[in-house]
Amino acid sequence: MAKVYYEKDVTVNVLKEKKVAIIGYGSQGHAHAQNLRDNGFDVVVGLRKGKSWDKAKEDGFSVYTVAEAAKQADVVMILLPDELQPEVYEAEIAPNLQAGNSLVFAHGFNVHFDQVKPPANVDVFLVAPKGPGHLVRRTFSEGGAVPALFAVYQDATGVATEKALSYADGIGATRAGVLETTFKEETETDLFGEQAVLCGGVTALVKAGFETLVDAGYQPELAYFECLHELKLIVDLMYEGGLENMRYSVSDTAQWGDFVSGPRVVTEDTKKAMGAVLAEIQDGTFARGWIAEHKAGRPNFHATNEKENEHEIEVVGRKLREMMPFVQPRVKAGVK
């Protein structure tokens, strides 16, 4: 079982007298910066010129280029997209790191897969809230918190663990609990969850269910409601109280169908396929493929995205959602 740390375990905040540079001001960046500031930390924001720069200024932060922010900071938290981090790190952060500094991440991908190679004289750790930035900020403002993970990759100063817990405490995570892990475990489980269940697995299951009904002659609108729209109702019940809560809340007919039909859809062969996905994450096959795809300009990424967006379930869904003004996406969908 994971070891969990709480507020009572952070007896001395070793970062309170340090300057923290938040690199990036998106979903996580704005939450980390504001929570740390509210907890008395000295925070600056490092960005390239653009909308995020203006937003951070409006929110009252001193904003600098990434290089300028890194140069003056004791702690550098990189909250940029995975694929952008190596280039920004090499060009703007690495030349400005000093011995004893802390290099911090919210995901271990680039360190674990050797895309970012920190010098031996800095501490390297991650603090990863298990929720989106807006939730990290809102719960903090309400006196609560989102749980987080932390891991130490490199302890150059002898107090990297204390620094990691101090940072987690600064964003409020110790109110809920901070689980200790490793860069390897955080990275591999995160990627597996995305690919086999949360994104890849769910979208494949939803499309397969939709196509099965439509191919059998049922109206696509009904197939959409049954296989995609109502998924939120079930996921919310699971989110609130696990599988037990979901099964308690649905009809007995639905629960019995769960018991007798679920294992026929997700079979032992499915688990073997999941094992193959995990193996490709563990041996670096997935990471190498994604890095190569990004460096090539993402031709397959964009082509697949365009094709998927025109699947019948998407065409039908767009029309049906016009009937439901209460269903609004948090962000406008489009090509990244």
UniProtKB/Swiss-Prot annotation:
Q: Which residues are noted in the entry as Mg(2+) 2-binding?
A: 190, 226, 230
For this protein, the record's Pfam families field holds: KARI_C, KARI_N
Superkingdom of origin organism: Bacteria
* Catalysed transformations (reactions): (2R)-2,3-dihydroxy-3-methylbutanoate + NADP(+) = (2S)-2-acetolactate + NADPH + H(+); (2R,3R)-2,3-dihydroxy-3-methylpentanoate + NADP(+) = (S)-2-ethyl-2-hydroxy-3-oxobutanoate + NADPH + H(+)
| InterPro entries associated with the record | 6-PGluconate_DH-like_C_sf, KARI, KARI_C, KARI_N, KARI_prok, NAD(P)-bd_dom_sf
User: In which pathway is this protein known to take part?
Assistant: Amino-acid biosynthesis; L-isoleucine biosynthesis; L-isoleucine from 2-oxobutanoate: step 2/4; Amino-acid biosynthesis; L-valine biosynthesis; L-valine from pyruvate: step 2/4
Q: What is its EC number?
A: 1.1.1.86
A GO MF label: NADP binding
Q: Which cofactor does it need?
A: Mg(2+)
- Under what name is this protein listed? Ketol-acid reductoisomerase (NADP(+)) 1
